[in-house]
Amino acid sequence: MVKKIGILYGMENTFPHAFVERVNKKNVKGIVAEAVQIGSVRQAFPTDYAVIIDRISQDVPFYRAYLKNAALMGAAVINNPFWWSADEKFFNNCLAETLGVPVPKTVLLPSKKRPTDTTELSFRNLKFPMDWHDMFDYVGFPAYMKPHSGGGWKSVYRVTDPQDLWNKHEETGQLVMMLQEEIVFEDYFRCYCIGQKEVRIMPYEPRNPHHLRYATTMKTTGPAAEKLLATIHDYVLRLNKALGYDFNTVEFAVRDGVPIAIDFCNPAPDADVYSIGQENFEWVVEAAANLAIERAQMQDPNKNNLTWGTFVQNSVRNLPITHVAEEVPAVSSETPAPKARKSSRKKSGGTNEAS
């Protein structure tokens, strides 16, 4: 019996095709890969796929519903569509604090405009005025205001004082925003995590144009660099195991030698060869192909084949949120990405732009 691995994708081109080609090139007995094909979606009816890699359902609700049905009927969907639907960035920050992973000081802000079909009576539980001074004293200025959910670097604002915040908050409509401490950093990293075990730590410059963000090098050197990479590796695994993501990126801004998690809710992260570079692209294609094959071999159509994070697992078992079932492995010598060419652009200040 042949098991199919499907990839569901949108406008991206380089990663999906390379992924399918890589899986098929491995010529594993009983495993083939292709782009997902959907002709009709019947309730409680299985798909043709043992494994589906999801790269687009965050933008297409029809696909998200299709994937939930596929998962219910035994497909191993990467990433878990039920958790992805429930997850958002403010919760991620809250969970990170319970896990001992440093994050910027962050507060949640109500939307500027009321949600559709609500009135002022819908908000009688909010104090008026809210304790803005307490929030501002906690977070400080400058700060970043960005949506509490979603991504793609959309609707992210740097605010310098309360009046600047009010002015920019006017532009956010019905978006629920969060206000986050600005981190002025000496190093910045973006990290792939595949299968909650494979980690790729990449020097990253979020202030560069999109196609040059990986054109940078690690600034920390010597024993401090080794310690920093080991800590980042630990935090990446800790976060992804708690959240239950099998394909994700985590971003860290390093301030005074401490890696601070800026963004770690990216279940369909950028994997385009023209932005991440050839060597990083090769790594993520290989890691994703190996993960998909492994999951296809393990997949049992009569069971739930989704990955659930330790946050959910421990809740079901009535264990503490921070309970860890096994030790996190030490960082390997192959973890750091190769150094990229240096950018000649000068930088100043910090950023929490990732959203």
Placement of each model-derived feature along the sequence:
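Active-site nucleotide/adenylate-binding loops and adjacent lid/helix of ATP-dependent enzymes
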Residues: 2-9, 71-74, 82-189, 195, ...
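Conserved N-proximal alpha/beta basic substrate-recognition cap immediately N-terminal to
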Residues: 10-122
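Phosphate-binding core of ATP-grasp and ATP-grasp-like enzymes
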Residues: 173-176, 182-218, 233-249, 253-260, ...
